Amino acid sequence: MSKLEAILSQEVEAEIQALLQEAEAKAEAVKREAEEKAKALLQARERALEAQYRAALRRAESAGELLVATARTQARGEVLEEVRRRVREALEALPQKPEWPEVVRKLALEALEALPGAKALVANPEDLPHLEALARERGVELQAEPALRLGVRAVGAEGKTQVENSLLARLDRAWDALSSKVAQALWG
């Protein structure tokens, strides 16, 4: 090989080596850039997943808290309904108690006071004997109504005006206030 060929061959070889080094450097730079982008993308994705996880965890905790609150509210409602049922049972048992004649008489007095000039007093047939003396004293007629329980009804002239005074109606009217007091006593 001639000297010229050797020089050309060396130059070509040097140029090839330079191109290879440049290509390797560019490839290394591209690789580094790609790795940095991939790392940044991976970190961003990890942060997004972590944020999604925290949000899902907060939603699950909120849902759990809501379920617990709902269960507590439902349980409290059931307890209050049980209290109300027992109070009704106690009221319904009053006619068998020795103090019932005095209770029904007081209910009748309150009804008559609320309706001055009443002409009749209506009560359950079983309660009429307890009200006979009061009816004579007040000059009102006694009338039987089997459906009327735990109370009385004063009836005005011509039957247009009536005042009912029963323990169950009183319980119904007072239940909101009573139930809040019961709840306060039970749960603070």
UniProtKB/Swiss-Prot annotation:
This is V-type ATP synthase subunit E. The gene is atpE. Keywords: ATP synthesis, Hydrogen ion transport, Ion transport, Transport. One of its GO terms (cellular component) is proton-transporting two-sector ATPase complex, catalytic domain. Gene3D superfamilies: ATP synthase, E subunit, C-terminal (3.30.2320.30), F1F0 ATP synthase subunit B, membrane domain (1.20.5.620). The keyword Ion transport applies. Belongs to the V-ATPase E subunit family. It comes from Thermus thermophilus (strain ATCC 27634 / DSM 579 / HB8). Produces ATP from ADP in the presence of a proton gradient across the membrane. Pfam families: vATP-synt_E. GO terms for molecular function: ATP binding; proton-transporting ATP synthase activity, rotational mechanism; proton-transporting ATPase activity, rotational mechanism. GO terms for biological process: proton motive force-driven plasma membrane ATP synthesis.
